[in-house]
Amino acid sequence: MKTFNAKPSEVEKKWVVIDADGVVLGRLASIVSMRLRGKHLPTYTPHVDMGDNVIIVNAEKVKLTGNKLADKRFYWHTGHPGGIKDRTMGQLLSGRFPERVIEKAVERMITRGPLGRQQMKNLRVYAGPAHPHEAQAPEVVDVGSMNPKNKR
């Protein structure tokens, strides 16, 4: 039997919507990254963007295990002397853009390079329950019911 290689023109991309309310962040990110890469498909080809378009709603209601809300810190430097800054995970989730927490968690699970950047463009994250993609008729994927450990 000959090895199957999918061509970009043959790829059928689906739209899926995932509700992040009460779902553990790392488990959600790992499932979303698998979907974005297309590894859930039997026709997976590593060098082709064949993953789904993923919409995540209620990003501000994602859960973290342990004491990560208070203890996990993110650092950056402004470039000026003494310009090191930091925020806790709790500050990021209660700040202006809570969806960035999920975006970064997924981005760090996707391969780095041009294909990974293309696959990240297929991810849309919204802080609230509404999204503007109803016309695509997205299929609902319930991550919380896949495994009892996924939900808190």
Swiss-Prot record:
Gene Ontology MF, one: mRNA binding
Name the record gives this protein: Large ribosomal subunit protein uL13
Stored Gene3D superfamilies: Ribosomal protein L13
NCBIfam families assigned: rplM_bact
Quaternary context: Part of the 50S ribosomal subunit.
Pfam families (UniProt xref): Ribosomal_L13
One of the protein's GO biological processes: negative regulation of translation
Species the sequence originates in: Paramagnetospirillum magneticum (strain ATCC 700264 / AMB-1) (Magnetospirillum magneticum)
GO cellular component: cytosolic large ribosomal subunit
Gene that this sequence comes from: rplM
Region (Disordered): 132-152
Keywords on record: Ribonucleoprotein, Ribosomal protein
